[in-house]
Structure formats: C-alpha cells, structure tokens
Curated annotation (Swiss-Prot):
Protein name: Protein PMS2CL
Family membership: Belongs to the DNA mismatch repair MutL/HexB family.
Transmembrane feature ranges: none
Disordered: annotated segments: 1-193
Chain coiled-coil ranges: none
Biased composition (Basic and acidic residues): 1-15, 22-58, 76-86, 98-109, 142-155, 163-173
Gene that produces this protein: PMS2CL
UniProt biased composition (Polar residues): 180-193
C-alpha cells in the first residue's frame, strides 16, 4: 500500500465520529512508528558503528505522506523509537539504576561485569565459579591452589566439604553457588532464586 492510499480513507473516517478519529490517530501513529523503526533498522544495518541517528531521513518520511512532519516526528522521537538507543548509550556508560550501581560496586574485580540491553548485570566468570568465588583477596589466592588440586583429582564425594563458597559470595558479586553436599538442601546458607 502507498502512503497516499492510506490518507484518503483516513480523511473519510475521521469525519464520521470522534471515537474513530482517536483510533485512527493511534493507528496512524503506530504506522509511522513502524516505518520509522524500519528505516532506522536499515540504516543501522548498513552502518552498524555510526553513533548518530539519521535525523534528515525522518523529516521527508512525514512530508511524503502529506502530514505535518513536526507532529509525527516529535511524537515518535519523544516516545518510541529513539528511547532504546538512548538507553543503550547510557547503559554502556554505566548503570543509571541505583541497584545496578550497587551491584557493580559490590564486585571485587575478579570477573568483568557487563550490562545488557535490559540493564541486567552479567558477571563474566568463565565456565565455573570456584576461581572467582573462593579467591576474593590476595591472601586467599594461596589456598586457591589447594582448591584447584582438589578439583582435578577428587578422592571422595566429601572433597569439597572444607571449601565454603558461600562466605565470599556476597563480597565478589558472584552469582553461582557451589554446594559441598547436595543432599543437605535445607541448610540456612542455601539461597533459593
């Protein structure tokens, strides 16, 4: 469908009743948002590293349909399409939410913390937690070699009974748990997510 084909039925329907007019306005705004998102997506696919948004492309889009570009473009830029890009920029600079900031500050630096598009912190700890959770201070790193030797050649199922990952879990911000004895799930140290 062409933009000119959409305008003619909308003008006729707007004269019928005010309730249809608000519905049609909502429909028109949603169509313009879809077109805007589509044009932005193609622009970002062609130039993925471009930090600027294509401002000049939006103005002709509203003018081609015969609508005032200021009302349509302003409504889109204020509410919908540009918001995810602004959030992505702010999340790359650091967390703006106080809870995210506290979570990153709680990290001791053994694992890198990244923030995804929704703002959740994801610790990059590798395939297992023992090296990040157990060695939280330089003094604990000497005992880390002992833990690694037990991991490589465990003699019995109780080889991890003397290792307590829970004591350093809050200090490092590590999200993983190592339970020494999986049969005892009702201990007070066990956290349920």
């Amino acid at each position: 469908m062409h933009a000119a084909d959409l305008e003619k039925p909308m003008v006729e329907k707007q004269d019928q009743s005010p309730s249809l007019r608000t519905g049609e306005e909502k429909r028109d705004v949603s169509i313009s948002r879809l077109r805007e998102a589509f044009s932005l997506r193609h622009t970002t696919e062609n130039k993925p590293h471009s930090p600027k948004t294509p401002e000049p492309r939006r103005s002709p889009l509203g003018q081609k349909r015969g609508m005032s570009s200021s009302s349509t473009s302003d409504a889109i830029s204020d509410r919908g399409v540009l918001r995810p890009q602004k959030e992505a920029v702010s999340s790359s600079q650091g967390p703006s939410d106080p809870t995210d900031r506290a979570e990153v500050e709680k990290d001791s630096g053994h694992g890198s913390t990244s923030v995804d598009s929704e703002g959740f912190s994801i610790p990059d700890t590798g395939s297992h937690c023992s090296s990040e959770c157990v060695a939280s201070t330089p003094g604990d790193r000497g005992s880390q070699e002992h833990v690694d030797s037990q991991e490589k050649a465990p003699e019995t199922d109780d080889s991890f009974s003397d290792v307590d990952c829970h004591s350093n879990q809050e200090d490092t911000g590590c999200k993983f748990q190592v339970l020494p004895q999986p049969t005892n799930l009702t201990s007070p140290n066990t956290k349920v997510f």
